């Protein structure tokens, strides 16, 4: 339970007059949003955030003042966990949170701009942005999910991110850190913090934590545990929260059945961290568990769409760890599987990670390689022994599958572009009716 001030403090701030610069920034952001929507260029939230920050560089801090905020970060699972945390916190009051996963400054500012009176916030934040966003919003809780290679040409060395997070956490000693003790890099980032809630959230991908981030010596694993051979004190902490295939377990003997609307063991770990964060903010544990179970489609992830004679479920994966987890969610009994890979800047143009993903799991399933980098994917599938065809356009790839259920697994821009194409197709069908 938090001992910080309740939301009453923020309520009193709602009547506080904002500086002129901030008021002008908010008005300009609203105008930018309207213009973006009026011209059909999008929802306008991002451009609104960019405009507001340009006019008032302090606007994030000013809009977050008085809010009790939880930040959620990590390489994978940020959007889903943020949605779960917001749902679990909702019993406490209105929660400001991103609807679209926009996790850098402009998206965060846009969210705070649109929900100024909310006394709570659950903010998804890109790993590299956590230190300065924390300085601006002074989070009550920081959730650290996992750390692994993301985009090799964007981030470079994952240990650098761990060090920056560790340094950022040190600047906020009153923040409660909800950390995944199964992840070596996350544990290192949180290890020195005075207030840590350890969660056994799982770590199916361990390829980026074979050596100790603090000493460089090997990490030795045994069962669920791990330890550094270079520092006898640096080892897997004892978790206060954990889960199994049916239940969630917490402090003081708490346990409850946990049934989720999203697939995969990784999401059970995400849900456990979301519950731990909400309880740290003051939520009732049983109500928090029930709330995370209501979260289904998240920014298009896990959504099911009817396209002609195909029922299409979409999954997003952005890096080796995410791909490996997403592959385990694929329904092997589906009538078709489309894997779409692009190599644009937001995806990371270095696709060498394809060789780290175990596509051998689809030796018995008909796969369609798609996306701008379908040829690269095709080579990887060939070496994996996965029977496949190559259809670069994802919509055409779906159409090439037998009628019935089709699983689509795509990286970031391929997922985004497919979503736009499916919306366009849906509008066209409505126009024909």
Label each residue range with its predicted role.
Residues 75, 99-100, 123-126, 146-147, ...:
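Fold-independent oxyanion-binding glycine-rich loops
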Residues 1-45, 65, 279-284, 290-433:
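ATP-dependent carboxylate-amine ligase
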Residues 85, 89, 108-112, 271-281, ...:
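Buried hydrophobic packing segments
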Residues 3-9, 13, 17-198, 205, ...:
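Phosphate-binding loop of NTP-binding sites
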Residues 112, 158-159, 208-219, 399-407:
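Short, surface-exposed amphipathic charged segments that create phosphate/polyanion-binding patches used
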Residues 58-87, 259-261, 277-279, 289, ...:
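A short, flexible N-terminal coil/short beta segment enriched in small residues
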Residues 145, 178, 270, 274, ...:
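Residue-level signal for inorganic ion chemistry
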């Amino acid at each position: 339970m938090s001992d910080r001030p309740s939301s009453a403090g923020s309520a009193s701030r709602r009547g506080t007059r904002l500086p002129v610069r901030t008021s002008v920034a908010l008005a300009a952001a609203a105008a930018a949003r309207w213009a973006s929507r009026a011209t059909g260029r999008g929802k306008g939230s991002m451009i609104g955030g960019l405009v507001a920050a340009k006019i008032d560089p302090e606007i994030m801090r000013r809009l977050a003042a008085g809010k009790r905020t939880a930040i959620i970060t990590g390489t994978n699972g940020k959007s889903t966990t943020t949605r779960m945390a917001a749902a679990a916190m909702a019993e406490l009051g209105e929660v400001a949170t991103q609807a679209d996963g926009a996790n850098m400054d402009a998206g965060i500012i846009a969210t705070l701009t649109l929900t100024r009176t909310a006394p709570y916030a659950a903010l998804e934040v890109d790993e590299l942005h956590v230190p300065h966003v924390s300085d601006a919003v002074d989070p009550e809780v920081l959730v650290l999910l996992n750390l692994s290679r993301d985009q090799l040409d964007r981030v470079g060395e994952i240990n650098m991110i761990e060090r920056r997070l560790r340094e950022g956490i040190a600047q906020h000693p009153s923040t409660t850190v909800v950390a995944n003790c199964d992840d070596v890099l996350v544990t290192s980032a949180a290890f020195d913090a005075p207030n840590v809630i350890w969660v056994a959230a799982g770590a199916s991908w361990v390829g980026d934590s074979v050596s100790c981030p603090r000493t460089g010596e090997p990490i030795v694993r045994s069962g669920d545990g791990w330890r550094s051979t270079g520092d006898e004190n640096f080892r897997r902490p004892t978790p206060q929260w954990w889960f199994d295939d049916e239940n969630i377990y917490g402090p003081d003997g708490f346990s409850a059945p946990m049934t989720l609307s999203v697939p995969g063991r990784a999401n059970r770990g995400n849900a456990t961290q979301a519950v731990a964060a909400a309880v740290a903010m003051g939520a009732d544990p049983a109500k928090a568990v029930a709330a995370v179970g209501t979260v289904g489609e998240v920014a298009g992830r896990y959504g099911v769409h009817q396209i002609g004679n195909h029922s299409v479920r979409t999954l997003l994966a952005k890096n080796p760890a995410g791909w490996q987890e997403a592959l385990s969610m694929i329904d092997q009994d589906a009538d078709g599987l489309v894997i779409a890979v692009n190599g644009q800047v937001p995806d990371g143009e270095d696709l060498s990670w394809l060789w780290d993903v175990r596509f051998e799991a689809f030796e018995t399933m008909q796969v369609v390689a798609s996306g701008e980098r379908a040829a690269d994917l095709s080579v990887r599938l060939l070496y994996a022994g996965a029977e496949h065809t190559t259809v670069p356009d994802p919509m055409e790839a779906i159409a090439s599958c037998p009628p019935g259920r089709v699983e689509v697994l795509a990286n970031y821009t391929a997922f985004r572009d497919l979503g736009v194409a499916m919306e366009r197709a849906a509008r066209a069908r409505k126009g024909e009716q």
